[in-house]
């Protein structure tokens, strides 16, 4: 008799599946967009949504009714939970500082799956999993260009090269 499965198997062992989903979520949080098969993206999406919701618990609005000691304990607990599930301090920091604030007003639905054409080799349904409200490529290019303009040193005034040659000739 066919029984319902609570976990999508994805044709992998439990350890392999856990590592794959963890890596997909880390890549999603780092690059804010990943491409894979739709079946994998659906599993990664549910995991990513839970992780972002957990990060939102550290916001001051969610901890307002706690005293200082309990607030610090809750922040520490949530941070350690995220680190134990993601294993990357850079991603946990980005999650707590940037993404939690970005989605503070949103109640769920932090990601979306955009379906692409099927993969030609095996006809697997492909898709893109991306964070909602992320910056577009044009905005990122404009920001990068603005940063480059700020970092460029002001051009120095060029002195005529003849003056150097005349000084060298005068000293001989």
Swiss-Prot record:
One of its GO terms (cellular component) is cytosolic large ribosomal subunit. Residues 140-160 have a biased composition (Basic and acidic residues). Residues 140-172 are annotated as: Disordered. One of its GO terms (molecular function) is structural constituent of ribosome. Keywords: Ribonucleoprotein, Ribosomal protein. It comes from the Bacteria. Pfam families: Ribosomal_L17. Coiled coil: none annotated. One of its GO terms (biological process) is translation. The keyword Ribosomal protein applies. InterPro entries: Ribosomal_bL17 (IPR000456), Ribosomal_bL17_sf (IPR036373). The keyword Iron does not apply. Part of the 50S ribosomal subunit. Contacts protein L32. Belongs to the bacterial ribosomal protein bL17 family. This is Large ribosomal subunit protein bL17. It comes from Leptospira biflexa serovar Patoc (strain Patoc 1 / ATCC 23582 / Paris). The lineage of its organism: Bacteria, Pseudomonadati, Spirochaetota, Spirochaetia, Leptospirales. The gene is rplQ.
């Amino acid at each position: 008799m066919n029984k319902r499965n609570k976990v999508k198997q994805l044709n992998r062992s439990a350890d392999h599946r856990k590592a794959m989903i963890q890596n997909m979520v880390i890549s999603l949080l780092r690059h804010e967009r990943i491409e894979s098969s739709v079946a994998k993206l659906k599993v990664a999406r549910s995991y990513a949504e839970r992780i972002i919701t957990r990060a939102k618990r550290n916001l001051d609005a969610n901890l307002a009714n706690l005293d200082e000691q309990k607030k610090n304990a809750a922040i520490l607990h949530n941070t350690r939970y995220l680190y134990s599930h993601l294993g990357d301090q850079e991603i946990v920091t980005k999650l707590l500082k940037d993404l939690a604030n970005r989605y503070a007003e949103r109640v769920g639905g932090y990601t979306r799956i955009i379906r692409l054409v099927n993969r030609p080799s095996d006809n697997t349904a492909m898709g893109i999993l991306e964070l909602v409200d992320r910056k577009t490529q044009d905005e990122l290019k404009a920001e990068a260009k603005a940063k480059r303009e700020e970092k460029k040193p002001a051009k120095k005034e060029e002195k005529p090269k003849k003056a150097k040659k005349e000084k060298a000739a005068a000293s001989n």
